A protein has these predicted regions:
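Rossmann-like NAD(P)-binding element
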Residues: 1-5, 10, 20
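Adenosine-phosphate binding glycine-rich loop
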Residues: 11-124
Length: 124
């Protein structure tokens, strides 16, 4: 459900935490409002909040490739470790650079892609 939180909606939010479980649920106007309200509304941006599904898909791929089977508990534990680590890194980067959680998460993602391309080349 994309772009359902626009500027006026973001101004009216009464939540303490906005965890974006969908892809792109906020408009750029809403993002500006949420950045101004960051002391009131703690934003967990979509790029971070909903990455668990992608991570678990990767786990499935690894298990299939290596003919492994992880229990549900093992998958959940591995997911918790990665999500907790990513959350901490985004929060640290946001505080260090004085930017929103979304800007921090996006910058970190772009930097990781850039590093991978540098290491492997454009067409591996």
């Amino acid at each position: 459900v994309e772009r359902v939180i626009d500027g006026p909606t973001a101004e009216k939010l009464h939540c303490r935490i906005l965890a974006e479980g969908a892809n792109g649920p906020t408009t750029p106007d809403a993002d500006r409002v949420l950045d101004q309200r960051r002391d009131e509304v703690f934003l967990i941006p979509d790029i971070l909040c909903n990455s668990g599904g992608v991570i678990v898909s990767y786990f499935e791929w690894v298990q299939g490739l290596q003919r492994l089977f992880w229990s549900e508990d093992e998958v959940n534990n591995r997911l918790k470790i990665l999500m907790t680590r990513a959350f901490a890194k985004v929060m640290h980067r946001s505080a260090k650079d004085g930017v929103s959680h979304r800007v921090a998460a996006t910058a970190m993602g772009v930097e990781r892609v850039q590093a991978a391309k540098r290491a492997r080349g454009l067409f591996p």
